[in-house]
Regions:
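Short, membrane-interfacial amphipathic segments enriched in basic
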Residues: 1-6
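Amphipathic alpha-helical interaction/coupling elements
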Residues: 7-11
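Secretory targeting signals
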Residues: 26, 30-47, 54-63, 68, ...
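Terminal transmembrane helical anchor/hairpin motif
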Residues: 39-64, 68-116, 123, 129-130, ...
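Short cytoplasmic-facing helical segments at TM-TM junctions of multi-pass membrane proteins
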Residues: 203-207
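Short cytosolic juxtamembrane segments of multi-pass membrane proteins
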Residues: 376-380
């Protein structure tokens, strides 16, 4: 255990010498303090305490007005994703059968086929159209049912939460969303140099010359960076929690439920940039791949899923969009959905989306295993 902790400590010392990591710590600290100071408690004419912006905010436009919408949209979105997938697929299949029937009928008419040939095709098209319209009505009814169920959940939960508590939860949830972007962007750049710096000539020679197993070196470097990130994140959460608690009197412990989701996202990104750093020994390439993976790929996957849903509910069907959407959903971890999960945890919305956790865990284990195997094979 001693050598492992020594590697962890060495990673911490390396971080203190990195300008990027220090900038990340500074940005997290500045944001945490600013987020506390940017809000204030006001009293409405009827004596209700609400949370508003510190500058330009009025008691009539408190943050609590967004609580119902955020809670409902998060709840209905997660439920719709699970309950509508099957009916949407059935509707899509019915649409494809209707299209094929229409094509066969058009072809028969173009060839001026005999009536006894066209009549069965017309009957087939009519049946396919009726089937599609039935499945479409069933889907629309299910969409309304999901929306109504989410509204009932909001109506049941809302009376037990004061306006001020709602405002604090919304403010915390929004802060988590922004903090995720700040920390992920900064951490990619900060951790990208850990392994390339260790593998540089001289540094790694000293390590492997000591009685330290390579698995201890590898995990020590990885865990060291991740623990340091977690400590900085915990400090930021602590500042926001204490600051908002003292300013508002609302101590929302559920706020900390977002932390494990953020740490998991950071662990996954760190595993990727570490993998690139081990294979290429290039900090710059690790940073570039990390940003491409987190930003460009994430927006591409999210865009495909939104496009597929919009087309499906609008009555337009493109098979290739559906295939790409479903394939990308299970091929890549959904950082956007993890971010939504973190916000849902703050609002205490009773939803759990296992897909990004399952896919992300698979990626994490694969990257760490293959990265370590390559690191073990390196000849120093």
């Amino acid at each position: 255990m001693g050598p492992f902790l020594a590697i962890v400590g060495d990673t911490w010392r390396q971080s203190r010498q990195q300008v990027v990591f220090l900038l990340l710590i500074g940005a997290m600290a500045l944001f945490s303090v600013a987020w506390v100071l940017l809000c204030r408690v006001q009293v409405t004419p009827d004596g209700t305490y609400v949370l508003t912006l510190a500058v330009g905010g009025s008691a009539e436009s408190g943050f609590e007005i967004d609580w119902d919408n955020q809670y409902k949209e998060t709840l209905s979105g997660e439920q719709a994703r699970d309950r509508l997938r099957g009916p949407e697929r059935e509707r899509r299949q019915a649409f494809e059968r209707m299209e094929r029937a229409a094509e066969r009928l058009l072809l028969a008419r173009a060839r001026e086929a005999a009536p006894e040939v066209k009549q069965p095709l017309e009957a087939e098209l009519a049946a396919a159209k009726e089937d599609f319209e039935g499945k479409d009505r069933a889907l629309q009814a299910l969409v309304k049912e999901v929306d109504d169920a989410a509204q009932r959940a909001v109506d049941a939960r809302s009376p037990g939460v004061s306006a001020l508590e709602k405002g604090v939860q919304v403010w915390m949830s929004t802060g988590v969303m922004i903090l995720v972007w700040i920390t992920m962007f900064g951490f990619i750049a900060a951790c990208a140099g850990y392994f390339p710096a260790m593998l540089a000539a001289g540094a790694v020679d000293v390590l492997v010359s000591k009685p330290i197993r390579r698995i201890e070196i590898f995990l020590g470097k990885y865990v060291g960076g991740l623990v340091l990130f977690t400590a900085a994140l915990a400090a930021a959460f602590g500042v926001m929690f204490l600051g908002l608690g003292f300013r508002t009197g609302v101590w929302h412990l559920q706020f900390f439920a977002a932390m494990p989701v953020i740490v998991f996202s950071a662990a996954l990104l760190y595993a990727l940039v570490a993998w690139i750093g081990i294979y290429t020994r290039s900090t710059a390439l690790a940073v570039i791949v990390g940003y491409v993976y987190y930003v460009i790929l994430e927006w591409f996957v999210w865009g495909l899923q939104v496009l597929d849903q919009v087309l499906a509910r609008g009555g337009v069907e493109y098979r290739w969009v559906t295939v790409l959407s479903e394939g990308s959903r299970w091929a890549f971890p959904g950082f956007g959905r993890l971010r939504i999960a973190a916000q849902a945890a703050v609002l205490d919305v009773p939803v759990f989306d296992a897909q990004p956790l399952v896919v992300g865990t698979a990626w994490l284990l694969l990257l760490l295993a293959t990265g370590y195997l390559w690191f073990r094979r390196l000849d120093f």
